[in-house]
């Protein structure tokens, strides 16, 4: 299979796994290894980032009406220093707060992500561990969370 066809397959893998409770990044590392593809570009962090940028573009486009509501609401809350008013102000800031842990981990673990976390064996083990954690959370966790139940500490968690 040529590199272009492999890239198409990788794009499909990214599209299918991004919205499931599995690691799309992990699958982007596992699939070439299982398929025996050794193209350095397809196995690169740069290619993985490009696929994720494509996913981001698709999300921004699909949810554009929500973003057009939430961004001005979040900015208005910042300007007025108040979450009072419509629920969009609060939701915009809950989303912003929920991104903080990922941002911090990304900054702190950048070097590891670029090197060690791209090793196939480690990725396979972490996918199994992540699956076990999701299974336990599904078995023991609450099944229902309404928007009114969301708090800033829960957004951070």
Give the positions of each predicted feature:
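Multi-pass membrane proteins that catalyze or facilitate reactions on polyprenyl-/lipid-phosphate substrates
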Residues: 1-157
């Amino acid at each position: 299979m040529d590199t272009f066809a492999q890239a198409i397959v990788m794009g499909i893998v990214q599209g299918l796994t991004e919205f499931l409770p599995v690691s799309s990044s992990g699958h982007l590392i596992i699939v070439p290894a299982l398929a025996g593809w050794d193209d350095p570009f397809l196995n690169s962090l740069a290619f993985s980032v490009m696929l994720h940028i494509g996913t981001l573009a698709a999300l921004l486009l699909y949810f554009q009406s929500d973003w057009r509501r939430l961004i001005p609401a979040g900015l208005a809350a910042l300007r007025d220093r108040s979450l009072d008013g419509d629920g969009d102000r609060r939701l915009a800031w809950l989303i912003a707060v929920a991104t903080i842990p990922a941002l911090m981990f990304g900054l702190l673990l950048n070097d590891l992500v670029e090197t060690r976390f791209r090793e196939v064996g480690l990725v396979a083990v972490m996918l199994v561990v992540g699956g076990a954690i999701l299974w336990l959370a599904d078995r023991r966790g609450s099944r229902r969370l309404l928007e009114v139940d969301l708090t800033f500490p829960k957004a951070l968690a």
